[in-house]
């Protein structure tokens, strides 16, 4: 089994504000489905109003760092047998959230 990070950029969800309850329910339905399938590890949204903090070479600096056009808006971590399975779950998340999702394999699992 391999873990994957599925994420979207903050600001990529461009649906009308009145659609938010329906989008949230659709996203929660996918999470419930992933939990029932035993593939859900963790997920959540990133609060964009919080300043980031960066730790480098033993020191900590207030951010945000670096200047960037895209910031992660939310993510899911799943554990599935194959890349194709990860892509299938990413497609379900994309459909429910109405925005593109990026899929990345997690190379290091501290539990292994």
Q: Across the structure, where does each feature detected by a protein language model lie?
A:
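Conserved, structured core segments of small domains
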Residues: 1-112
């Amino acid at each position: 089994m391999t873990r994957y990070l599925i994420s979207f950029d903050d600001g990529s969800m461009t649906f009308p504000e009145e659609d938010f309850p329906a989008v949230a329910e659709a996203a929660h339905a996918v999470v419930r489905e992933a939990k029932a399938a035993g593939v859900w590890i963790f997920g959540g949204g990133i609060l964009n109003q919080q300043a980031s903090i960066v730790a480098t070479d033993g020191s900590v600096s207030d951010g945000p760092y670096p200047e960037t056009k895209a910031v992660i808006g939310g993510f899911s971590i799943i554990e599935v047998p194959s890349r194709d399975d990860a892509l299938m779950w990413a497609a379900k998340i994309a459909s429910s959230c109405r925005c593109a999702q990026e899929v990345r394999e997690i190379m290091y699992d501290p539990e292994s």
